Amino acid sequence: MKTIIAEKPSVAREIARIVGATKREEGYFEGGGYAVTWAFGHLVQLAMPDGYGIRGFVRDNLPVIPDTFTLVPRQVKTEKGYKPDSGVVTQIKTVTRLFKESEQIIVATDAGREGELIFRYLYHYTGCATPFVRLWISSLTDKAIREGLRNLEAGGKYDDLYLAAKARSESDWLVGINGTQALSIAAGHGTYSVGRVQTPTLAMVCARYWENRRFTPEAFCQLHIATDGCDEGTVKFSSSEKWKEKEPATELYNKVKSAGTATVTKAERKEKTEETPLLYDLTTLQKEANTKHGFTAEQTLEIAQKLYEKKLITYPRTGSRYIPEDVFAEIPKLLAFIGALPEWKGKVQPKAVPTRRSVDGSKVTDHHALLVTGEKPLFLSKEDNTVYQMVAGRMIEAFSEKCVKDTATVTAECAGVEFTVKGSVIRQAGWRAVYGEEDKEETAIPGWREGDTLTLKGCSITEGKTKPKPLHTEATLLSAMETAGKDIEDDALRQALKDCGIGTPATRAAIIETLFKRGYMERCKKSLVPTEKGLALYSVVKTMRIADVAMTGEWEKNLARIERGELPADTFCKEIEAYTKEITSELLSCDKLFARRDSGCKCPKCGTGSMQFYGKVVRCDNADCGLPVFRLKANRTLSDDEIKELLTDGHTKPLKGFKSKQGKSFDAIVAFDGDYNTTFVFPERKTSRKFSGRKK
């Protein structure tokens, strides 16, 4: 008998059908000489510190660096600590028996770093010695599964992939466990979760937040002139210079207005070619789904995974935007399939030769770029269909012709002031016709030449203010994670740097969600805004190595080198252990940043503890309560007296100087709600508000 192990029951069911394992047993399918079982994610994980006899957060125990990591069944948190999940334990027993009764194991977990780790951890935990081979496929269509089963690969081929996954898992454990315990011990209150990837990610969100909030707008003035354009239209020039003071701008405006004409000093015309966009990888799909449709990164990943399991798209957790030659041979057939869908009628040219910009086998790692499979997309929800059509539409774009534009840049002088205008006209829409972008308004520039005199139809002066960089959205944060914070727009260059980013396409959504779940940031429409807790953590760690984005990018680069067999995993692990010791010492030493003072106030929630000042937070010293009150509220820090008033009366007096997320100033009362969270009450509504957080 051969045992096939899949990552999920749904995938196991499809494989079982194909190999003839039609008899359903507890935890597996059987038949045709096969047993097909599943793991439903990680059945086995690294033990928590108490698995090594270390309990609680104790300074002298740090850093916790096991000589050998212990594997245990997946744990669930209970009131008495972490316990093995009973359902997981049952499934492990089933898998162990099947492994030992089999002549061969076929590994059909997801074909990637994490899928490999799921199997290898389970294999080592069970103590199994049965030989195994790898089913490595990029889609779950019947055709792909059958071809994969005919071309099984040696299990040892993916040893380096496993070593990279193992190194990632152990490094995350070392940094997360030791960093969290060290910072929490230093703080003396509460739990502050830190991590190898989550903390640098939070640092990028907080740094952008403060850059935005501390930005001082500068006023400027700009001049504009208008003259006759093409087809009875008007062409508007803008001054090359902007003036900080209105007076000189007004003087020049009057001179320009009096002049009545402008002289062309330079006229440049060029043909501009816009290359087709590359196919989607997961991160690019997530970014565009967030920008265009408001989907979260996690939502897009969940939908893409669902579409993959329905056999509609290829493997979603890919970091490549390219396909190899053998897949390119299938593209004409796939494009014909897409062209027959109602959404894309008339968008695919039947006999056109697909362009090759997205074809490069050397840039394909575990999996190629996202493609549709040719299975009909039936009965999809609105959201699922949106993501499916995004993948289909991008395929049409990627294999269409280039877009060709005629561009013009004209410079003119009037009364000593230089004005410029830029325009373009699409000559060949190419890929831009897929979404109708060729119909967007264009600026056609007449055939002016140097020395031509232009009669002014009007002139104007506008006033504006410089703007800060906007707060991060999930799309911009994903971009920053992809390039370790570097601002890079070029798609090809971003791909070249993808090994230096933080996180992987498969993990970035989970990292972002972790920051939400741990209360470090929240969504405000599309923007990501750090909470008081997130800003408090950032203020402590922002100059430390734990928050160093570039260094975290180097770790990811080294993990990719392990995967390619270019770096021994032991070398990486020794470096991570040394780093763990450094950051543990660094975080433990920051207890001075958490200096403690007694507020003199009883806890309004439990009535027994005393509220203690710890820098940016005030917290109850009763371990069973631990009520936190953050000083920073809407860009304003509450004073000691204001905090004491809040703790004593349940609310402050009306306070000035708050600033909204949109940058608008406002006055408000800070009060406790019924759950002792702080909230704003506005003075004009004070009489209708009942304060629920008064002192007991």
What are these model-derived regions, one by one?
Residues 1-169, 173, 179, 349, ...:
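Intrinsically disordered, low-complexity regulatory segments
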Residues 87, 142-227, 269-270:
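C-terminal or mid-to-C-terminal helical accessory/interaction module adjacent to the motor/catalytic core
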Residues 243-280, 286:
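Metal- or metallocofactor-binding catalytic centers and their adjacent structured scaffolds
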Residues 2, 81-83, 125, 180, ...:
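Basic, low-complexity terminal or inter-domain segments flanking catalytic cores
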Residues 9-16, 33-36, 40, 59-62, ...:
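Amphipathic alpha-helical transducer elements in NTP-driven molecular machines
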Residues 109, 287, 317:
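Short glycine-centered, acidic/aromatic-flanked micro-motifs in structured strand/loop junctions
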